Structures are given as C-alpha cells and as structure tokens.
Amino acid sequence: RFFPHADKYEIIRNFKKPDNFSYNTYFTYPKGGAIEYVNSLYRRVDPKKVSLREELISIDKRKKTAITNKREIKYERLISSIPLPILMNKAKIKYDKNIYSWNKVLVFNLGFNKKGNDKINNWVYFPEKKYSFYRIGYYDNIFNDNRLSLYVELGFANNRNIDSNKYLELVIKDLKKAGIIDNHKLISHVSIIMDPAYVHINKESESDKIRVKNELQKHNIFSIGRYGDWKYCSI
C-alpha cells in the first residue's frame, strides 16, 4: 500500500530524463538529532503543561478523566498518539487482539575508531537471509565525520525475547562479512528495542480501526499518528 505504481512509460521516460519527486528528493537531518523536532515543539508550549515520567493507567470515557500513576486529569478533548491497541486497553474498548499485529526492531548505534569502507551511502538495505540485519545507516556520511558511526536494525516477531548482547556479537560478525568493517575497533555502542516498530496492516484491522476510532470520537478521544492511526508512514 506504500509503494507507488510502476508505470512502464514513466520508467522508460526516466531513463532519458531522470527526475525524482518522492519524499527522498530532499533529505535533511538536525545536527542535534531527531530530538530537535521535539525540542522545537517544546519551546512553543507552556512548559508547566508538559508532564514527563508520568504513565497513563486508564481512561474513564464517561467521566472524561485520564488516570495516571500520579493523578487524575479532567479533559474536554483527548488526543493520543500511543499505539492504538494500548489506547483501546486503557479506554476499555473491546477488540479482537488477533487482527492487530506488529514486529519489534532491535536498533544498535555503533561508533568505531576510524572511517568505514563506504563513504557515499546514507543507508543501505540487506534483503539476504545470511545477514542478521535488514538495514544499516551511516551517521558519519550524513555529518561528514572522519570516524564510522552506524545504526543497525534487526527485525523480530513481537513475542520474541531479545538479548541485545547476544546480537551485538552477531552484528559485528555480519558487518565484517558484508565488507562494512574490517579491522575496525568498536569504541562505543548503545541499543534500543522499538516495540511496536512496524505495524502489520490487513483488511480486518483497517475495517476494525474505523469502528474503534468512531467509538473513541464519541467520547472526544482522537487517536492520531503512525501508531495511533495504526498505519505505515514515514516522517
């Protein structure tokens, strides 16, 4: 549903005169990382109304009250971007859990002692099963740094228990196998598990999502965003 239709005429025409009007035409990235998008939004709101380290426990739709681990908050309209299945659980909306599925992604951020072999690409996909990862990206090529820094992504089923240390050794081995590194020394690393990462879209979930969102909106609850709207989209 995300890939554009491949028209034979357009393919032949692009051989003669290439053009690109996709979201990849221009690529920008803040110097401080993607967190700068959040910081920019934060500077435009009242900081007294921003609450951190506060967990939503449940939502009382009838009383229009959100219960957290610290307090109860009365609301007129509630806008949520948390994953839709989690919101349904919090708001006590019945749904078939079998039709909502997703995967986990283990992400490694790796820093090495010297520049890598690939000095051109920003990111590369690896569809071959012989590699543990499906995509890597080069921070150093984006920022024109003189030492290799990568993000490496590995996909898993949502019910898998993931040992990050175990997979770090495998990733280093596969990076060497792919020719990304050779005698490089790893000097810094950190990992994070995205759960959910990519949602699985099917006819049943798309249909049920309409029902759920209509029910939520009756109580002035609006579920938005990549995970709130349970869809695949880019930044």
Regions found by a protein language model. Give the residues of each.
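Active-site rim elements
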Residues: 25-28, 159-160, 231
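General small-molecule cofactor/ligand-binding pocket signal
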Residues: 51-53, 187-190, 222
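Active-site/ligand-binding neighborhood in enzyme catalytic cores
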Residues: 1-62
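Mid-domain catalytic core of redox enzymes
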Residues: 54-179, 206-216
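Short, well-ordered alpha-helical scaffold segment located
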Residues: 44, 83-86, 229
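C-terminal catalytic lobe of FAD-dependent flavoproteins
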Residues: 180-181, 191-235
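Surface-exposed helix-capping loop/turn segments at secondary-structure junctions
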Residues: 47-50, 75, 177-187
